[in-house]
Each structure stands twice: as C-alpha cells, then as structure tokens.
Amino acid sequence: MADVEDVRAFALTLERAYEVFVRGRRKFRVGSLVFVAFSDDEETIEFGFPKDERDGLIASDPDTFSLPAPSDLRFNWVRARMDRLDPVEARELVVEAWRMCVPQKVARAWDEAHPDGP
C-alpha cells in the first residue's frame, strides 16, 4: 500500500517541485501547475495523466483508478485509491505527472540520472 508520507518525500525530491496546502488539501506543484493532490482524508490521490490515456488506465484496474470529480474532467487528471497502489506504482505515477509540468530538458536530466526509473 502506498503511503502519503512516502509519496510526499519522493515528490519533494523532484526538481522544481514544492508542497502547498489549498483549503486543507495537500498538493504538489511545479510553478503554478499542480501535478499531485490528495483528498482531504488523504485516502485518494489525484495526479496529472494524459486525457487520451486515462480511459485505458481506469479500465485496467477500475477498483484502483477513477475519473476525477466532474468539475475536474476538463483537466488531465485521474484519481486513485491509496490503499490499492503499491509504493513503486505510486512513485511512477508521480514522476509521470511531474513530467507533464516541467520543461523537457528537466525531465530528460531526471531520466539520465535515474535510468531504472523511480
């Protein structure tokens, strides 16, 4: 099971990433772009994910993944239950969400420094 503190510690290692609290919710940003957000109770994580791929992700494991709230459907977001994610999968999703917010050269530098992934 993925743990909020593990996700937090990992997210903060990513270049340009920082943590904020918005209306009591823990979020991680690059600049003004949010790439990860937790629910109020921190039982679900929402993360950036390409819109054209999210139906496939959700279909692959509907007990874990779901669409975001209707008000967020216009954004590149997917929601996941923390109790269904393993720590490695959570880190991979966080990196991919972060990648959507940083310049390509920053993402490439991370890839070069971490050839085996997170």
Task: List each language-model region with its residue ranges.
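Charge-dense, helix-prone N-terminal extensions
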Residues: M1-P118
